[in-house]
Amino acid sequence: MGKHQNTVGSSTYEKIKHDIIFGQLVPGSKLKLELIKSQYEASVSTLRETLNRLASEGFVLAEEQRGFYVTEVSQRDLIEIAKLRVLLECHALKASVGSGDDDWEGNLVAAHHKLQLMEKKMIAGDISEKETWKRYDWEFHLAVIKACNSKNLLDLHSILYDKYLRYQMLVFTF
């Protein structure tokens, strides 16, 4: 039973985070538990846990006695996220270059190739596969820093990447 709840909680977390990143849940909108309960097929307690987790990552704002809201977007926030992402990626890249092996390099080349092919399609006007592009872009950026040997750095990068992606999806640029 505990495992099932973890699966439901993880699934709910992924769905809501996806909907925030891809704009189905609009910045500033109130997340009314009773309304989203059926949409995400989750209990109120699972939703509270999920929304608190997303609040700790900065995707949701939890206001005492008022509820949960999708975090607003701003130019200032975007600039800060972009600067932090560059800082982390450059640091992780240095570490990866220093410790990466042939497998790391091969995975990096393969990830770049997949992303490059997808971006050629998108430049040609085919934007039907933005989910696939998102996955390939993530795989490439992760491959670049994967050999940094720091789980904490990779975890922080993942959160910043998703925050940055949210801004990209609002205007859909790549």
Task: Label the predicted regions.
Residues 1-98, 152:
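Short linear motifs at protein or domain termini
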